[in-house]
Structures are given as structure tokens and as C-alpha cells.
């Protein structure tokens, strides 16, 4: 895989190349285009112009032999107690720095284009900086964080150098609503103020930011307030998705979930008013909770699949060091790739 100015990540496939565009978060497959043609070019501008000329080759005919992305739950601890957290009952013991870096290097050897670092709360991990240094310039990095830890604002220069996309979850700017869906274990913590302070620090260093919002029946009427706050902060990217089923919320999931039509209705209403100020997007749940298409690593460094309602499945003879063949044997790689792959018909 080659990296172009921390903006493009290009990987050879059996029948072409896949290009991951960091700024747009799009994966594009160019059929029968060879990576050696890209290697002849020197700058991002040259590569982008060349790919634009080859846009007729973009399709979904990829040989599904290698997953695009993996999500690493690098830290099991969290300072919040979100009512719908899917990771709560899957966290295991922390590992040593040596073991953490072994996992990071194995991820690189497997050729993933994008690695998501989450948890728990990843900024609690004492090894987060080491992992980012290991990945820097070799793959694309996302961090999924609640944004309430000061550590996030203290590492902005490294995040900028590695072009890390920081995805911060804000489910409400109303303290009462926030305490219902994302209660803080430290009752004295003003999480909104810390989030805003961290956003300002990230913006000062031009670190890419995206806000995530989990939409439920509890907070759906308060999305306009979030939009106003994001505009005031100068945030340009906002992604919404409905709450997913998790063991933690199984007893009240039906009460808090939205149908896709309900989610679309509130999304379009907010977009109508704020779409010219914020780049907004939404994800609609397809409800396939049995599919083995999401690849994860727990805080022990074990690779696994999570079909949510059917539990987890560890991969390979040694789940800490599975081979690509073992991953593909268990992962529905085709469904995994289709979930990310851009198609021309979408525009």
C-alpha cells in the first residue's frame, strides 16, 4: 500500500486498485488499474488528476480478498456509562506496551487501509500515542472518542502529523438529556465544556474533526440545538445514525430506537435548515445483526467478529495473530467491502 500526503491510501488488489480518500471517507475501486502507474507520480495533485481521468474504471467488480477496515477497541475503560454501549460487556484486561505494539504491527502486516481506534474510551489508553506513531504514514487512522478527556487536547500536534480523523460523539447539548443517554461516572465533570475546549484545540491545529450523534427517541427533538452549537464552533462535518441493539439496552431498545423513516425525517428537517453550513450525513441500519461483516480487535489484541445478537467469534488458531486467510475464512469479506465501497450510482 502507498500513502500520498496523508490524503490518499492506495492498495493493489487482484484485479485493480482500491483508493481510500481520507477527506471524503470514500473507498473507490479502479478495475484493471495497476499501482505501478500511481508510483510514477510524485504529488497528491498529480495522483488526483490521474485518477480523475480514470474515473470510468470505478466500479464494484473488486475481487473480495482483503478487508478494508478494522476497529480496535484499544482501551476497555471508559469515563462514561452510555445506555446503549455495545462494548461494555466485551472489554477484557489491558495489555502491556509490548503487546499493544505487537498488535499494531500485525495490523500493518495484514494490509488494512483504515484503522479505527475506539473502546471504551481510547484517549484513556497510555499507549495511544505509541500506536498512532506506529501507524503514522502507513495507514489511515480514525479515533472514536467521547471527547471528554483532556488527553485528547494534549495530543493535537501528533494527531495533525498523522492526519488522524477525530470522531467525537455528541448526543445532546442539553445537560439533562445528556445525563440520560451518556451519563458521566464523575458527576462533577462538565463534559460539554471539555468537549468544546477539545474541539477548539483540535481546530487550532487543523486536525480533521467529525461529530457523531446517536439518534434515539430521547434526543431526536434536540438535534437542532446540536446543529446550532456545531455552527457556533465552526464544525463542518456531522454524521447521524440510529441507536443499534446492544445487550446493555436490550430491555428498553424498542422504546428508544427510531425506524429508518423516522431517522430520515428528523435528518432531513435538520439538513434543510443547516445543510448549507454543515456537511451532514446519515447511516440507516439494515438490521442484519447476524452478519459476520464487522471485524474488530479487543483490548487484549484478539481479533474477532461480532454478530451482536449471536455473540462474538474469535478468529484463527491464535486470535492475537490470525493470518489473512483465517480472517477471510470467517469474515464475510464481500459484505464487509460492499458496506464501504463507493459506487458511481450513488451520485
Question: Model-derived features: where do they sit?
Answer:
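Radical SAM/AdoMet-radical enzyme domain recognition
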Residues: 97-117, 125-240
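Canonical Radical SAM [4Fe-4S] cluster-binding loop centered on the CxxxCxxC motif
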Residues: 62-99
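Accessory C-terminal segments flanking Radical SAM cores
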Residues: 1-37, 246, 252-254, 275-347
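Exposed loop/turn and edge beta-strand positions of beta-sandwich/beta-sheet ligand-binding modules
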Residues: 68, 111, 291
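Residue-level recognition of short loop/turn positions
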Residues: 81, 146, 298-301
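Radical SAM enzyme [4Fe-4S]-AdoMet core and its adjacent flexible, acidic
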Residues: 8, 176-292, 299, 308, ...
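Long, charge-rich, low-complexity alpha-helical segments
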Residues: 30-68
